[in-house]
Swiss-Prot record:
The keyword Lyase does not apply. It comes from Methylobacillus flagellatus (strain ATCC 51484 / DSM 6875 / VKM B-1610 / KT). Is required not only for elongation of protein synthesis but also for the initiation of all mRNA translation through initiator tRNA(fMet) aminoacylation. It catalyses: tRNA(Met) + L-methionine + ATP = L-methionyl-tRNA(Met) + AMP + diphosphate. Its cofactor is Zn(2+). One of its GO terms (cellular component) is cytosol. This is Methionine--tRNA ligase. It is found in: Cytoplasm. Residues 590-692 form the tRNA-binding domain. Binds 1 zinc ion per subunit.
Amino acid sequence: MMPGTGNTPANAWSAPRKLLVTSALPYANGSIHLGHMVEYVQSDIWVRFQKMQGHTVHYVCADDTHGTPIMLRAEKEGITPEELIRRVHAEHYADFSDFLVAFDNYYSTNSEENRELASQIYRALKANGKIATRTIEQYYDPVKHMFLPDRFIKGECPKCHAKDQYGDSCESCGTTYSPTELIAPYSAVSGAAPVRKETEHYFFKLSECEDFLRQWTRSGTLQPEAANKMGEWFASGLSDWDISRDAPYFGFEIPDAPGKYFYVWLDAPIGYMASFKDLATREGLDFDEYWKPDSQAELYHFIGKDILYFHALFWPATLKFSGYRQPTKVFAHGFLTVNGEKMSKSRGTFITARSYLDHVKNPEYLRYYYAAKLNGSMEDIDLNLEDFVARVNSDLVGKYVNIASRTAGFIAKRFDGKLGTVGENAVIAELRAAADSIRESFENRDTARAVRDIMALADKANAYVAEHAPWDMAKQPEQTAALHAVCSVALEMFRLLTLYLKPVLPGLAQAVEKFLKIDPLTWADIDRPLPAGHQIQAYQHLITRIDPKHVEAMVEANKESLQTHAAVVPEQKQVASEATPESVYISIDDFAKVDLRIARIANAEHVEGAEKLLRLSLDIGEERPRQVFAGIKSAYDPESLKGRLTVMVANLAPRKMKFGLSEGMVLAASDERGGPFILSPDSGAQPGMRVK
């Protein structure tokens, strides 16, 4: 896909752009966890990439601070809601900063800017005939003496009949509804059966906006799967949106309605505008340039797929009929699973961002792993903790940093820290030629493809170093000039790889820039190699391997007490650790019959009709790739496998299966503790090499 097609704006590579980017506002009622971090890492990578292109980008967010949950939690803690949200704001900001998420402004929806904008938008909607008042029946908690907000009523979904769903939307099927439509409702505050009482509420006439929304959602503003979901909701009919709540409530009072407050989902997205308005005031920016109806600036929202309804229906309609521009695009992502399952407190996989930082320390390990999984779609991604350790150690330590660690020392010791002439080099030319493809992947949020391509280039750089073996050249005085050239070429490759990885690994890139004594890298630096005689610093360790024990400690620290659970769990079979009995030993001659080869996974895809299999296309240096069916579907997404190196049995007799011919076997580890986990060779291994 070339610039100007698909998801890429026309002239994206040359014309200067002005972008306003937002991430969804985290609710100020709890800690940031690793599921939340998927979105903030994804959006931060995209923003950093755009800034490296030389575009003007403003990246804003805020805490979502209003609603009954905030009010009740503050009451429980014996503090004011304002005190609670100030404390949580500081915690959230620290978590994002330590994960290198670089907001240009991180604000709060409990601000005067947000109050003014929410009131102004409400008045504009009312003037346009889009606000109605209706007397409704609403649930009332007879124990707490309060009307119950949607999220404090639970019951059975009226559409799919899932149990324990909230009063405004079903987390199982995504349907929105009114609380009175719930089956067998109960108060989430007191547990009491609520009673119905009449009250006057304010509604946004969303049903009158359907023609506009049908056009807007099909105009390329949404991913195809999101647009299809819109079609389902249109088919069900759009309901008018209740935008008011009764006192007591922590939020903004509706200007002409004493005792009535804006529903949190009205003023929360307006918080994007308020955060930017605060930034604009501080930095002298023109607020209207980004928000007026004819704005030429681009507006992008990154969100989770669970809040698509609010951002793809309510929000654009609110903007349209109050006189503001609509988003250029809304990017929705999927959920995070850990080890193939929903995050769980009992299993220790409901992990907070702070717990990760306390145990694993380096945020860039997780930034890299998420980048290697995200492809711009709404698919869920899995954090497999063993694969996380293996991939980071293999890719970042064994491949990427390995290039510098094996060559930079010679520059310092033998050449006074000065680089030699790079000249023409086929591998460097290949690295530079990949720039447009990598840029396209980043632009379209397909960081999995970008990372895959970058690591393939790192393999080629490592192969260059291994082929020339500077450690051997250093022993031969007549090879001094060649040694200087080889190490200088390798460090130019390392510089280019650092440039490509910089949106993902900004902290590591900054350390490399200091080591190479260069200005912050931008995309324009691809064709600007370091000149002969350029002085670099002595090489210092850039990154360490992840210790699996730190990951294990993190999981243990996040486990809730399992004593009750353990009492009813049958005894697990002991995993054998004793030496293999002598009766099953094989001779070296027997082992030599097995032809184990390094294989590159050229392609991986699902097999229609197969519950456990993936179809792999394996390159082992032959004329054509081998087709192998592997029972690893439960552990791996096909996209995450493409480009990886693994180990296969190359001389296994072909086996005819109902899905086709399987021409070998990939090796994977598993036992009662988990798996399968495919094997990955160390850096330098190439397709076709024999494992001995």
